[in-house]
């Protein structure tokens, strides 16, 4: 009977744990939806900004552009912006980003370049601080769905490092959202910007949908609904001055989008991890229930045998 009680207690513990993992999965799923809504809300501004920049590029393509954010100089020091999460329970999300960051730092060392780190997320901060890596700034405790103001604070730090020539290039490592079960740490150069190579944000968005009792992500192409800018648009100010004013906005927008993708990747990883944990808990409950029933049946059989044996002894 003691064995039966132990199995019952373990089944109860696993059921309680499964309730927690299922709740965390549902919360992560809801936040993925919110992340999608925020991406869509910021799209009109991003599209229009890209259109204006393209128009300015066209006008300035035959001119020598001398702007601080476009200045390319010999690279001696690189600032690496590493984006991870503040919490765990999200599978290999944080580990994969940190591993890619270490690989990139080794590549920079092999090229004879110095580096400094700007870190977003407590997990990366804890890892690199314990190992005495050079760190310029740490940002933690950000909203799970990043805001433009938070992206602006980080962009200001990066601009300060670049414009003061403390660093000659700024690179970003974040996790690109692919699907609920797939994400990819990528490296992207943020500074210096290239007026001939500005790219609009990826015209692919993700939508969280349900099919049966399962959640899935569908990526789909989205075209801008904004009217195109006229090719003969007249600017009151010098196009070069306008470009100089818009480039920081473009940097902020690129950084915000990367933070949003990273947040969606973390939430999807957490949702997948909690879903797997719930499935494993359910399978374990089934196995333990079967063991409990077998043990109970064996105990009942043993009691019957003892009763029969006792009856036979009394004859």
Curated annotation (Swiss-Prot):
> Gene3D superfamilies, alphabetically?
3.40.1380.10, ATP synthase, gamma subunit, helix hairpin domain (1.10.287.80)
Q: What is its main location?
A: membrane
Compartments where located:
Cellular thylakoid membrane
Keyword list (alphabetical) reads: ATP synthesis, CF(1), Hydrogen ion transport, Ion transport, Membrane, Thylakoid, Transport
Query: What Gene Ontology cellular component terms go with this record?
Result: plasma membrane-derived thylakoid membrane; proton-transporting ATP synthase complex
Q: Domain of life, per the record? A: Bacteria
> A single Gene Ontology molecular function, please?
ATP binding
Q: How does it sit in the membrane?
A: Peripheral membrane protein
Pfam families on file: ATP-synt
* InterPro entries (UniProt xref): ATP_synth_F1_ATPase_gsu (IPR035968), ATP_synth_F1_gsu (IPR000131), ATP_synth_F1_gsu_CS (IPR023632)
Which Cys pairs does UniProt list as disulfide-bonded?
none
Q: What does the subunit section of this Swiss-Prot or TrEMBL entry state?
A: F-type ATPases have 2 components, CF(1) - the catalytic core - and CF(0) - the membrane proton channel. CF(1) has five subunits: alpha(3), beta(3), gamma(1), delta(1), epsilon(1). CF(0) has four main subunits: a(1), b(1), b'(1) and c(9-12).
Annotated family: Belongs to the ATPase gamma chain family.
The UniProt function text for this chain reads: Produces ATP from ADP in the presence of a proton gradient across the membrane. The gamma chain is believed to be important in regulating ATPase activity and the flow of protons through the CF(0) complex.
Indicate what this protein is called per its UniProt record.
ATP synthase gamma chain
Species per Swiss-Prot/TrEMBL record? Thermosynechococcus vestitus (strain NIES-2133 / IAM M-273 / BP-1)
- Please state the gene responsible for encoding this protein: atpG
């Amino acid at each position: 009977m003691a064995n039966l009680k132990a199995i019952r207690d373990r089944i109860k513990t696993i059921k309680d744990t499964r309730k927690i993992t299922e709740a965390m999965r549902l919360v992560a799923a809801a936040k993925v939806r919110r992340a999608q809504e925020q991406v869509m809300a910021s799209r009109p501004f991003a599209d229009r900004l890209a259109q204006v920049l393209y128009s300015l590029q066209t006008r300035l393509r035959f001119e020598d552009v001398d702007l601080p954010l476009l200045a390319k100089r010999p690279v001696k020091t690189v600032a690496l912006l590493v984006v991870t999460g503040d919490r765990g329970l999200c599978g290999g999300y944080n580990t994969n980003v940190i591993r890619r960051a270490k690989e990139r730092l080794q590549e920079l060392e092999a090229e004879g370049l110095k580096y400094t780190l700007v870190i977003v997320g407590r997990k990366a901060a804890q890892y690199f601080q314990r190992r005495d890596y050079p760190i310029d700034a740490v940002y933690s405790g950000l909203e799970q769905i990043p805001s433009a103001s938070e992206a602006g604070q980080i962009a200001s730090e990066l601009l300060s490092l670049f414009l003061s020539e403390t660093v000659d290039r700024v690179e970003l490592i974040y996790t690109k959202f692919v699907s609920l079960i797939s994400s990819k740490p990528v490296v992207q150069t943020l500074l210096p910007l290239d007026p001939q190579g500005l790219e609009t944000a990826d015209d692919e968005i993700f939508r969280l949908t349900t099919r049966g009792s399962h959640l899935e992500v569908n990526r789909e192409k989205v075209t801008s609904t904004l009217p195109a800018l006229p090719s003969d648009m007249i600017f009151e100010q010098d196009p070069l001055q306008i470009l100089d004013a818009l480039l920081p906005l473009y940097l902020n927008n690129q950084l915000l989008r990367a933070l949003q993708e990273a947040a969606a990747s973390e939430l999807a990883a957490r949702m997948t991890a909690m879903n797997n944990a719930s499935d494993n808990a359910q399978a374990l409950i089934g196995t333990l229930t079967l063991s409990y029933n077998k043990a109970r049946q064996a105990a009942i059989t043993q009691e019957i045998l003892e009763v029969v044996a006792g009856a036979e002894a009394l004859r």
